[in-house]
Protein backbone atom coordinates (compact mmCIF):
# COMPACT_ATOMS: atom_id res chain seq x y z
CA UNK A 1 0.00 0.00 0.00
CA UNK A 2 1.26 3.46 -0.91
CA UNK A 3 2.10 5.70 2.05
CA UNK A 4 0.69 9.20 2.44
CA UNK A 5 4.12 10.72 1.81
CA UNK A 6 4.44 8.72 -1.41
CA UNK A 7 1.04 10.02 -2.55
CA UNK A 8 2.14 13.58 -1.79
CA UNK A 9 5.31 13.03 -3.79
CA UNK A 10 3.30 11.68 -6.75
CA UNK A 11 1.20 14.87 -6.83
CA UNK A 12 4.21 17.11 -6.29
CA UNK A 13 6.21 15.61 -9.14
CA UNK A 14 3.26 15.93 -11.54
CA UNK A 15 2.87 19.60 -10.59
CA UNK A 16 6.29 20.42 -12.05
CA UNK A 17 4.68 20.01 -15.49
CA UNK A 18 2.46 23.02 -14.71
CA UNK A 19 5.40 25.34 -14.08
CA UNK A 20 6.35 27.49 -17.10
CA UNK A 21 10.01 28.27 -17.62
CA UNK A 22 11.43 31.78 -17.41
CA UNK A 23 8.57 33.06 -15.24
CA UNK A 24 8.05 34.03 -11.61
CA UNK A 25 5.97 31.60 -9.58
CA UNK A 26 4.42 31.47 -6.11
CA UNK A 27 5.22 28.73 -3.61
CA UNK A 28 3.03 27.73 -0.68
CA UNK A 29 3.79 26.03 2.61
CA UNK A 30 3.59 22.50 3.99
CA UNK A 31 4.81 18.95 3.63
CA UNK A 32 3.45 18.44 0.10
CA UNK A 33 5.08 21.68 -1.03
CA UNK A 34 8.40 20.46 0.39
CA UNK A 35 8.18 17.52 -2.03
CA UNK A 36 7.29 19.92 -4.85
CA UNK A 37 10.28 22.18 -4.21
CA UNK A 38 12.54 19.13 -4.23
CA UNK A 39 11.02 17.90 -7.51
CA UNK A 40 11.29 21.35 -9.10
CA UNK A 41 14.89 21.70 -7.99
CA UNK A 42 15.83 18.33 -9.46
CA UNK A 43 13.89 18.87 -12.70
CA UNK A 44 16.35 21.34 -14.19
CA UNK A 45 13.53 23.73 -15.10
CA UNK A 46 14.67 27.33 -15.16
CA UNK A 47 12.43 29.94 -13.55
CA UNK A 48 13.13 33.60 -12.86
CA UNK A 49 12.33 33.23 -9.18
CA UNK A 50 9.77 32.22 -6.58
CA UNK A 51 7.71 34.20 -4.10
CA UNK A 52 7.57 32.10 -0.94
CA UNK A 53 4.87 32.16 1.74
CA UNK A 54 7.01 30.92 4.62
CA UNK A 55 10.52 30.81 6.00
CA UNK A 56 10.61 27.01 5.68
CA UNK A 57 9.76 27.13 1.98
CA UNK A 58 12.30 29.91 1.40
CA UNK A 59 15.04 27.86 3.07
CA UNK A 60 14.24 24.82 0.94
CA UNK A 61 14.15 26.87 -2.27
CA UNK A 62 17.60 28.23 -1.41
CA UNK A 63 18.92 24.68 -1.00
CA UNK A 64 18.04 24.06 -4.65
CA UNK A 65 19.42 27.43 -5.81
CA UNK A 66 15.96 28.69 -6.77
CA UNK A 67 15.95 32.50 -6.37
CA UNK A 68 13.51 33.77 -3.73
CA UNK A 69 12.01 37.18 -4.47
CA UNK A 70 9.54 39.49 -2.76
CA UNK A 71 6.06 39.93 -4.20
CA UNK A 72 6.80 43.66 -4.25
CA UNK A 73 9.59 43.02 -6.76
CA UNK A 74 7.38 41.47 -9.44
CA UNK A 75 4.30 42.56 -11.37
CA UNK A 76 2.62 39.17 -11.19
CA UNK A 77 3.10 35.41 -10.97
CA UNK A 78 2.48 32.82 -13.68
CA UNK A 79 1.33 30.12 -11.26
CA UNK A 80 0.90 29.48 -7.55
CA UNK A 81 1.52 25.98 -6.24
CA UNK A 82 0.25 25.02 -2.80
CA UNK A 83 -1.26 22.19 -0.81
CA UNK A 84 -4.52 22.00 1.13
CA UNK A 85 -5.84 20.57 4.37
CA UNK A 86 -9.16 19.89 2.62
CA UNK A 87 -10.35 20.50 -0.94
CA UNK A 88 -13.87 19.97 -2.32
CA UNK A 89 -15.18 19.24 -5.82
CA UNK A 90 -15.37 22.97 -6.62
CA UNK A 91 -11.68 23.18 -5.64
CA UNK A 92 -12.52 25.38 -2.67
CA UNK A 93 -10.20 24.62 0.21
CA UNK A 94 -9.43 24.84 3.88
CA UNK A 95 -5.80 25.83 4.35
CA UNK A 96 -3.70 27.24 7.12
CA UNK A 97 -2.90 24.24 9.27
CA UNK A 98 0.60 25.70 9.19
CA UNK A 99 -0.70 29.17 10.03
CA UNK A 100 0.44 30.83 6.79
CA UNK A 101 -2.98 31.28 5.15
CA UNK A 102 -2.86 35.10 5.07
CA UNK A 103 0.40 35.08 3.11
CA UNK A 104 -0.92 32.24 0.97
CA UNK A 105 -4.03 34.21 -0.02
CA UNK A 106 -1.95 37.26 -0.87
CA UNK A 107 0.34 35.29 -3.17
CA UNK A 108 -2.53 33.26 -4.68
CA UNK A 109 -4.36 36.46 -5.58
CA UNK A 110 -1.30 37.71 -7.48
CA UNK A 111 -1.08 34.56 -9.62
CA UNK A 112 -2.61 33.80 -13.00
CA UNK A 113 -3.29 30.17 -12.03
CA UNK A 114 -3.60 28.29 -8.72
CA UNK A 115 -2.52 24.65 -8.80
CA UNK A 116 -3.38 22.73 -5.64
CA UNK A 117 -1.47 19.53 -4.88
CA UNK A 118 -2.63 16.98 -2.32
CA UNK A 119 -2.88 13.32 -1.48
CA UNK A 120 -6.28 11.73 -2.07
CA UNK A 121 -7.27 11.83 1.63
CA UNK A 122 -7.65 15.63 1.35
CA UNK A 123 -10.36 15.42 -1.36
CA UNK A 124 -13.75 15.73 0.36
CA UNK A 125 -17.39 16.30 -0.57
CA UNK A 126 -17.84 18.99 2.10
CA UNK A 127 -15.40 21.21 3.94
CA UNK A 128 -15.28 21.45 7.72
CA UNK A 129 -13.92 18.27 9.23
CA UNK A 130 -10.50 19.89 9.42
CA UNK A 131 -10.46 22.76 11.97
CA UNK A 132 -10.72 26.17 10.31
CA UNK A 133 -7.82 28.49 11.23
CA UNK A 134 -8.71 32.14 11.81
CA UNK A 135 -5.96 34.74 12.26
CA UNK A 136 -6.97 37.31 14.88
CA UNK A 137 -5.57 40.40 16.55
CA UNK A 138 -4.67 39.36 20.10
CA UNK A 139 -6.79 42.06 21.79
CA UNK A 140 -9.89 40.89 19.87
CA UNK A 141 -9.43 37.15 20.43
CA UNK A 142 -12.24 36.72 22.98
CA UNK A 143 -14.64 38.89 20.98
CA UNK A 144 -13.93 36.97 17.79
CA UNK A 145 -14.22 33.63 19.60
CA UNK A 146 -17.69 34.53 20.90
CA UNK A 147 -18.80 35.44 17.37
CA UNK A 148 -17.44 32.16 16.02
CA UNK A 149 -19.21 30.27 18.78
CA UNK A 150 -22.47 31.96 17.76
CA UNK A 151 -21.88 30.74 14.20
CA UNK A 152 -21.86 27.15 15.46
CA UNK A 153 -18.13 26.60 15.81
CA UNK A 154 -15.96 25.57 18.73
CA UNK A 155 -13.00 27.99 18.77
CA UNK A 156 -9.71 26.93 20.31
CA UNK A 157 -6.62 29.14 20.66
CA UNK A 158 -3.53 27.66 19.03
CA UNK A 159 -1.27 27.72 22.08
CA UNK A 160 2.29 28.97 21.68
CA UNK A 161 1.89 30.02 18.06
CA UNK A 162 2.33 33.50 16.58
CA UNK A 163 1.88 34.24 12.89
CA UNK A 164 4.40 35.94 10.63
CA UNK A 165 2.53 39.18 11.30
CA UNK A 166 2.55 38.75 15.09
CA UNK A 167 -1.07 37.67 15.44
CA UNK A 168 -2.77 34.65 17.00
CA UNK A 169 -4.60 31.72 15.42
CA UNK A 170 -7.96 30.46 16.62
CA UNK A 171 -8.78 26.99 15.23
CA UNK A 172 -12.53 26.53 14.84
CA UNK A 173 -13.91 23.00 15.10
CA UNK A 174 -17.33 21.76 14.03
CA UNK A 175 -18.36 24.46 11.56
CA UNK A 176 -20.93 23.48 8.95
CA UNK A 177 -19.34 24.86 5.79
CA UNK A 178 -22.06 24.14 3.21
CA UNK A 179 -21.52 27.55 1.59
CA UNK A 180 -17.76 28.19 1.68
CA UNK A 181 -17.88 31.54 -0.12
CA UNK A 182 -20.52 32.95 2.23
CA UNK A 183 -18.75 31.58 5.31
CA UNK A 184 -15.40 33.01 4.21
CA UNK A 185 -16.90 36.47 3.80
CA UNK A 186 -18.93 36.36 7.03
CA UNK A 187 -15.93 35.43 9.17
CA UNK A 188 -13.76 38.09 7.56
CA UNK A 189 -16.38 40.72 8.42
CA UNK A 190 -15.84 40.12 12.15
CA UNK A 191 -13.85 43.01 13.60
CA UNK A 192 -10.46 41.72 14.74
CA UNK A 193 -10.20 38.99 12.11
CA UNK A 194 -7.28 39.36 9.72
CA UNK A 195 -8.08 36.36 7.53
CA UNK A 196 -9.50 32.85 7.70
CA UNK A 197 -8.44 29.62 6.05
CA UNK A 198 -11.38 29.14 3.66
CA UNK A 199 -10.13 29.53 0.09
CA UNK A 200 -13.36 30.02 -1.85
CA UNK A 201 -12.69 33.43 -3.38
CA UNK A 202 -9.21 32.15 -4.19
CA UNK A 203 -10.21 28.61 -5.14
CA UNK A 204 -7.78 26.47 -7.12
CA UNK A 205 -7.95 26.29 -10.90
CA UNK A 206 -6.45 22.80 -11.00
CA UNK A 207 -6.11 20.03 -8.42
CA UNK A 208 -3.40 17.41 -8.75
CA UNK A 209 -4.27 14.48 -6.55
CA UNK A 210 -1.82 11.77 -5.58
CA UNK A 211 -3.70 8.45 -5.71
CA UNK A 212 -2.90 4.74 -5.60
CA UNK A 213 -3.31 4.77 -9.40
CA UNK A 214 -0.95 7.71 -9.87
CA UNK A 215 -1.43 11.45 -10.32
CA UNK A 216 -4.97 12.55 -11.15
CA UNK A 217 -5.59 16.03 -12.62
CA UNK A 218 -8.97 17.45 -11.59
CA UNK A 219 -10.75 20.62 -12.63
CA UNK A 220 -13.56 22.36 -10.69
CA UNK A 221 -16.81 20.40 -10.20
CA UNK A 222 -15.46 17.18 -11.65
CA UNK A 223 -15.91 14.13 -9.47
UniProtKB/Swiss-Prot annotation:
GO biological process: D-ribose metabolic process; pentose-phosphate shunt, non-oxidative branch
InterPro entries, A to Z: NagB/RpiA_transferase-like, Ribose5P_isomerase_typA_subgr, Ribose5P_isomerase_type_A
One Pfam assignment: Rib_5-P_isom_A
Catalytic activity: aldehydo-D-ribose 5-phosphate = D-ribulose 5-phosphate
Top-tier EC class: isomerase
Keyword presence, Isomerase: yes
Keyword field contains Thylakoid: no
GO terms for MF: ribose-5-phosphate isomerase activity
The EC number(s) this enzyme carries: 5.3.1.6
GO cellular component, one term: cytosol
List of residues binding substrate: 29-32, 82-85, 95-98, 122
Active site: 104
Pathway: Carbohydrate degradation; pentose phosphate pathway; D-ribose 5-phosphate from D-ribulose 5-phosphate (non-oxidative stage): step 1/1
Keywords linked to the UniProt accession: Isomerase
Self-association and partners: Homodimer.
Role description: Catalyzes the reversible conversion of ribose-5-phosphate to ribulose 5-phosphate.
Similarity section: Belongs to the ribose 5-phosphate isomerase family.
Name of the protein: Ribose-5-phosphate isomerase A
Organism of provenance: Neisseria meningitidis serogroup C (strain 053442)
Amino acid sequence: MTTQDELKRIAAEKAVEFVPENEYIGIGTGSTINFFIEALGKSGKKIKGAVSTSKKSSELLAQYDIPVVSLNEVSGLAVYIDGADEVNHALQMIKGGGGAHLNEKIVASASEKFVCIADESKYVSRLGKFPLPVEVVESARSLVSRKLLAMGGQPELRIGYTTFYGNQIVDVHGLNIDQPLTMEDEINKITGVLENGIFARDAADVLILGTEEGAKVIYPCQG
